[in-house]
């Protein structure tokens, strides 16, 4: 992928916890993170040359400040705007709403897993979602169901999730 992808901490930590951090390298090539995210992911995510820290050169956008997000989400949103990132990788609902208001393209953890299946990088989404949930990653059951339906790994009446 050639466009710059700015990442928040939560999805990076989630992929590390399920042993799939390298999948992000495969999918994106390089991820850009602001300093607050770099601090949040250590020591959970070991430093990697394809996770590049980039400092903000402008103040955090007022719309972002008003959203009362965490430092990582705030800096990731502002950096994505500042450098005109092609994609923002973030899971938190409030941050995704602000991103939409700012005109940013967004993907979350489940979206990356679906894309990885579509492109043949993983065979199934369900085992990785199950492991995310075992590791304490919270996602609305409705979103899990939607993702598994999109991955053709669950029928509309399957209630395992």
What are these regions (language model features)?
Residues 110-154:
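Hydrophobic alpha-helical interaction segments
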Residues 2-87, 93-96, 100-105, 127, ...:
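Active-site-proximal, substrate-binding regions of enzyme catalytic domains
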């Amino acid at each position: 992928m050639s466009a710059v992808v700015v990442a928040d901490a939560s999805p990076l930590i989630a992929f590390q916890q399920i042993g799939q951090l390298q999948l992000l390298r495969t999918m994106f090539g390089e991820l850009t993170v602001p300093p607050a995210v770099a601090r949040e992911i250590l020591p959970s995510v070991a430093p990697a040359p394809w996770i590049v820290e980039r400092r903000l050169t402008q103040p955090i956008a007022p719309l972002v400040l008003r959203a009362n997000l965490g430092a990582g989400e705030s800096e990731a949103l502002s950096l994505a705007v500042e450098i005109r990132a092609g994609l923002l990788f973030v899971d938190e609902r409030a941050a995704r709403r602000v991103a939409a208001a700012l005109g940013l393209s967004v993907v979350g953890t489940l979206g990356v897993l679906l894309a990885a299946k579509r492109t043949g990088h993983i065979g199934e989404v369900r085992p990785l979602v199950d492991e995310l949930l075992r590791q304490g990653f919270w996602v609305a059951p409705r979103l899990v169901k939607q993702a598994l339906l999109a991955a053709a790994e669950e029928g509309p009446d399957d209630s395992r999730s």
